[in-house]
Amino acid sequence: NKKIKLAFLSSDINNYHSITYFLKTVLLNYDKNKFEISLILNSEEDNYTSKEFKSLCDGSINIKDLNDIDSINKIRQKNYDIIVDLMGVSSSNRLVLFKNRIAPIQATWLGYCNTTGVDQMDYIFADKNLIMDDEVNLYSEKIIFLSGIWNTHSGLEIERVKQDPPFIKNNYLT
């Protein structure tokens, strides 16, 4: 009855990035008796959101300043059962790590809602609204169709600061 070691890899666990509003719901509600959740951060950690998310998890590592080989080795040392990529084919992705099989089960979700094109990426989480029946053959991953909707949103906690527009102080429009 060992816990499943699940890690989320992302460059976007920072203040007010949209994926954090979706991931937070998962981190607040996972079954702590069945899962050990970790973050693999590919970004700065000195912000409110990364600190909060780390406190909701059982562990975290940062690979931002590591090259691919050192990142692969550091991740493999953790013996994760499942790693979920939250970036997909975005500018800060680390898909090359997944090409080197950093976990027995590798999946993508949330950050880029399309195929990664990486043969070693086993699964993508989606719903029938996200991936249509006639698009299934375009995915290199096995598609896990979730019932209902493929994501959840934790709500916004942004406090808006009222201030005059810059042109009032500057006396010109930009």
Question: Where in the sequence are the language-model features?
Answer:
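Alpha-helical solenoid repeat scaffolds of the TPR/TPR-like class and their adjacent stem/linker regions
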Residues: 1-172
